[in-house]
Amino acid sequence: MTIAKGCTNCEAERDTIAQGFHEMLKVLKQAKGQTEVQAKAALYDIINDKSLSDDERWTQMRPFNDLLSEQEESDIRIRRTILIGLFSFWELSLKYICAYYKLDVAGMKGIKLKKESQLKNDRILFSENDYLKAIFHSERPNIVDVISSKIKELRNYMTHGSADKNRQAVIDSIISEYPDFFVKKTHDGYYITSYDGLDNILKIINDGLIIAETTAKTLNVQIN
């Protein structure tokens, strides 16, 4: 991957990680497609083989049906893990942006530091919301709210496997408002049903980070 000249360290790192996620999703989607095509082709041949008895047909079909079932279960786990990774990419990138542009995260949180080293020595932990407050102060773009509320709640569900009424309402709103995320509700929970959905979430997160860094640059210029 080629990094454009003139990029900041934040931009270069973001572009590298985003491209890596995109390429990984592409490979996973292709692998899934190839497995399904081969298994379904084998099933088609078995189903249409008139020389087989019903018992023989069932016996020969079973390993391919099992393969498809195992493939889908594996894909569900992989998609869940990737979503968690995508949100971590968002959180850590916000932290890096604040550090790179020397934004006063502690001050926005109401913490007064006597020395710059105090932040490191006291190991003060900041949240995603703290970094967002340091970048956007009071008003946040809609795309940032989508990430920090809706996608965050979906990540929380994928991490913990549980959802109270509020979280369910948020995820249900994702299903209705963002069909390109490919989130599906079944009797036993919520699932991301396509790698394309994760690629679309990646694009939203990447766009949000571009806006965050652009805003941080402006703040940095104003401060200096």
Language-model features: where?
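Flexible secondary-structure boundary motifs
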Residues: I84, L92-Y191, Y195
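Extended intrinsically disordered or low-complexity regions, especially N/C-terminal cytosolic tails and loops
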Residues: M1-I84, L92-L94, N142-S149, A169-N224
